[in-house]
Amino acid sequence: MALFMAILGVLVLLLCLCSALLKWNEVRFRRKGLPPGAMGWPVFGETTEFLKQGPNFMKNKRARYGSFFKSHILGCPTIVSMDPELNRFILMNEAKGLVPGYPQSMLDILGTRNIAAVHGSTHKYMRGALLSIISPTLIRDQLLPKIDEFMRTHLMDWDNKVINIQEKTKEMAFLSSLKQIAGMESSSIAQPFMTEFFKLVLGTLSLPINLPRTNYRGGLQARKSIISILSRLLEERKASQDVHVDMLGCLMKKDENRYKLNDEEIIDLVITIMYSGYETVSTTSMMAVKYLHDHPKVLEEIRKEHFAIRERKKPEDPIDCNDLKSMRFTRAVIFETSRLATIVNGVLRKTTHDMELNGYLIPKGWRIYVYTREINYDPFLYHDPLTFNPWRWLGNSLESQSHFLIFGGGTRQCPGKELGIAEISTFLHYFVTRYRWEEVGGDKLMKFPRVVAPNGLHIRVSSFSN
């Protein structure tokens, strides 16, 4: 009996302590003028609930506090914004103190000179360097031919096989990007680079705890290995004096390039290019295959578009820019896939000083999470939003609307948007004109915090001509 009473006393004490901690944390952040919301536990905040409940966490918060509220997620005090017009203001006003606020693990692993980490004049310079190697002219003359050649080869031997389309699109996104960056030399560095790159990606999505066997430690080590691979490639190119028609060759042209980067900046920019395109291109391609399988009328329409292109060409003729421009329905499929699957959940900003926003005080150093998932499913913005309907993007000017944040927004809109669309469009062109496919079944999809098939997404592929 005495033991029972002692245990009961300890439990009551713990309950009181927990209640006091929660109350103290709320009082600590109850400054005059802050948006409504709750801060959860000290240190951990509401991160556990956010990751566990996912979209339901945000829905419940929105129902209780509205479209602009405070929380404590991802390791720091955070304001969550789901208001389309306010989101546009936040993303358009970096100069007013709303700078990128990405997690520390991402900044550490992608490098101090990566385009997501810098702002002001440095960001303008690095973005200019990036845009100079993915301009419409270079996409037309150099990058698209490489993409076409790669996709033809990558999709060559899928007939009569059961494949994991998740793994195939991951390989596709990585290897296609590497070919554009390093040209002919990409084949010699692909395998060691890819092994380390996948570790790097995991590290950016982890807590910044630098202990053995953590994803964060693995990401930091992977970064060192990738720097070694790229540094060796840069030195070999400097020694050879050969002309290389690829992204790396453009970046290394000191005399002809107005954006003169040192080796460290070039390496960080290459890692940024690889990282930025990898997740969006691979996951959008996988989910497009999934949605096309589930919606036969959409598949019929996209096949009609691509067979019309093939009828104008000889079998060996590559895709060119005029073909890309004619892929209006394919572009709509890509946008609708990105919207419905919500490949990117939101964008993070950080305040550089105390400021007023939407009538509330936002303290210096707080994160602002422009949460786009709920906007993608807003029935006032998208009719019947949970239905996969690419036709909604044809002739409705949705791409020019302020709530269109699938590729980011404001001064940080994804500079590689058109290049990514070109890669996915070319992949879909050869996939739907060469093959039929059916799902093997039993594979599950998770859509939060990332879109992923934990056990893969397996499909049985056969030749379309059969």
UniProtKB/Swiss-Prot annotation:
GO terms for biological process: brassinosteroid biosynthetic process; brassinosteroid homeostasis; sterol metabolic process. Heme binds at C414. Keywords: Heme, Iron, Membrane, Metal-binding, Monooxygenase, Oxidoreductase, Transmembrane, Transmembrane helix. This is Cytochrome P450 85A. It is found in: Membrane. It comes from Phaseolus vulgaris (Kidney bean). One of its GO terms (molecular function) is oxidoreductase activity, acting on paired donors, with incorporation or reduction of molecular oxygen. It holds the Pfam family p450. GO terms for cellular component: membrane. Catalyzes the C6-oxidation step in brassinosteroids biosynthesis. Belongs to the cytochrome P450 family. The chain crosses the membrane at residues 2-22. It is a single-pass membrane protein. Its EC number is 1.14.14.-. SUPFAM superfamilies: Cytochrome P450. Its main location: membrane. InterPro entries: Cyt_P450, Cyt_P450_CS, Cyt_P450_E_grp-I, Cyt_P450_sf. Its cofactor is heme.
